């Protein structure tokens, strides 16, 4: 997993409640187990019409949000069935951060495992960020994990917290496999002792 300390990027506002994993990546695209290649299918049914043409009114199809790497969502973001493909699609599309008032627990954990920083903040903060991004497409924020701050050049400043384990994983660029490999010698010693 790529380490995360400070990230500055364009904000895409998608503040809808209960965005579920089937909306994030529809089931017809879940035929592979590789982590890459899912970005083109992110929010597919919202981004494209039945003929496969981009819907111009969808935020991610608008030029001001091209290259966005910070997604702002609504309450209960990532609800529905557990599918790791959802954060894989978010990450593969180019998002490093998702900010929402609440996340579905399993989705939140899948984001950590996939290298997408999921930040919980108040609805008031989400609305303030979204309003700025809607008013000024291309609006950028800086997310500083070490300091626990979200800031904008316009003076916006929001403090946030993530649990210590998640913080460590992101700062050090460790996924579950990386964490396990840090204990490879102890695991080998245990296996020898119990063989």
From Swiss-Prot:
Its EC number is 4.2.1.33. GO terms for molecular function: 3-isopropylmalate dehydratase activity. The keyword Amino-acid biosynthesis applies. GO terms for biological process: L-leucine biosynthetic process. Pfam families: Aconitase_C. It comes from the Bacteria. Keywords: Amino-acid biosynthesis, Branched-chain amino acid biosynthesis, Leucine biosynthesis, Lyase. It catalyses: (2R,3S)-3-isopropylmalate = (2S)-2-isopropylmalate. InterPro entries: 3-IsopropMal_deHydase_ssu, Aconitase/3IPM_dehydase_swvl, AconitaseA/IPMdHydase_ssu_swvl, IPMI_Swivel, LeuD. GO terms for cellular component: 3-isopropylmalate dehydratase complex. Pathway: Amino-acid biosynthesis; L-leucine biosynthesis; L-leucine from 3-methyl-2-oxobutanoate: step 2/4. Heterodimer of LeuC and LeuD. Catalyzes the isomerization between 2-isopropylmalate and 3-isopropylmalate, via the formation of 2-isopropylmaleate. PANTHER family: 3-ISOPROPYLMALATE DEHYDRATASE SMALL SUBUNIT, 3-ISOPROPYLMALATE DEHYDRATASE SMALL SUBUNIT 2-RELATED-RELATED. Belongs to the LeuD family. LeuD type 1 subfamily. This is 3-isopropylmalate dehydratase small subunit. The lineage of its organism: Bacteria, Pseudomonadati, Acidobacteriota, Terriglobia, Terriglobales. The gene is leuD.
């Amino acid at each position: 997993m790529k380490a995360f300390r400070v990230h500055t990027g364009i904000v895409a506002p998608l503040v809808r409640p209960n965005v579920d994993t089937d909306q994030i990546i529809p089931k017809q695209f879940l035929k592979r187990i590789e982590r890459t290649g899912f970005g083109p299918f992110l929010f597919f049914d919202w981004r494209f019409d039945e003929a496969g043409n981009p819907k111009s009114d969808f935020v991610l199809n608008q030029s001001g949000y091209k290259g966005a790497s910070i997604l702002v969502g609504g309450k209960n973001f990532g609800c529905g069935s557990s599918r790791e493909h959802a954060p894989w699609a978010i990450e593969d599309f180019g998002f490093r951060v998702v900010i929402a008032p609440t996340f579905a627990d399993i989705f939140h954990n899948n984001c950590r495992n996939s290298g997408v920083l999921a930040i919980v903040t108040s609805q008031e903060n989400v609305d303030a960020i979204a309003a700025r991004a809607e008013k000024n497409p291309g609006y950028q924020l800086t997310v500083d994990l070490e300091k626990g701050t979200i800031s904008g050049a316009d003076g916006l400043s929001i403090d946030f917290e993530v649990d210590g384990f998640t913080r460590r994983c992101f700062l050090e660029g460790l996924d579950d496999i990386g964490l396990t490999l840090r204990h490879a010698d102890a695991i080998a010693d245990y296996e020898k002792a119990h063989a």
